[in-house]
Amino acid sequence: LWSDGDVPTTSEKFAAFDVGALRAQAVRVAGEAATLVADARAAGLTDVTTKSTETDVVTGSDRAAERLIRQRLGEWWPGVPVIGEEEGGSAPGGGLSWVVDPIDGTVNYLYGYPWYGVSVAAQVDGVSVAGAIVEPASGRVWEAARGQGASLAGQR
């Protein structure tokens, strides 16, 4: 993207990406993962463990959703880092990366409360430029892209 010797600013890097397309990809993959976790919740949870404390839980659905998201993003953006709550990761050197919380609100998910979502964001040099949150229980979708505003269920 950049000629030899040029050191682009973060703003120039933002301009190199179609943030609307990044937003659409975040919506799509978060929607796929939301369907996966809702179906798993309806089938009943069997794989639940704790992380750092008794109230910091992770389910098999968290892991499965993160794997799905990583797989899809890897197909669309080979080699681009994905930083996830369950599997971790890092984005050395900046540039484009994805940040994922496969089930934001796992305790609510575990106890059958509808207040949880799948969160996916694209970042450039650590600054969020596009993202989506899908709430499986209601089907609501929050989405945003830098310079294009934000919406909930299509309403700004």
Roles of regions detected by a PLM:
Residues 2-103:
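N-terminal subdomain of lithium-sensitive/metallo-dependent phosphomonoesterases centered on the IMPase/IPPase/PAP
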Residues 92-151:
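DPxDG-like acidic metal-binding loop motif
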Residues 155-156:
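Conserved beta-loop-beta connector loops within the AMP-binding
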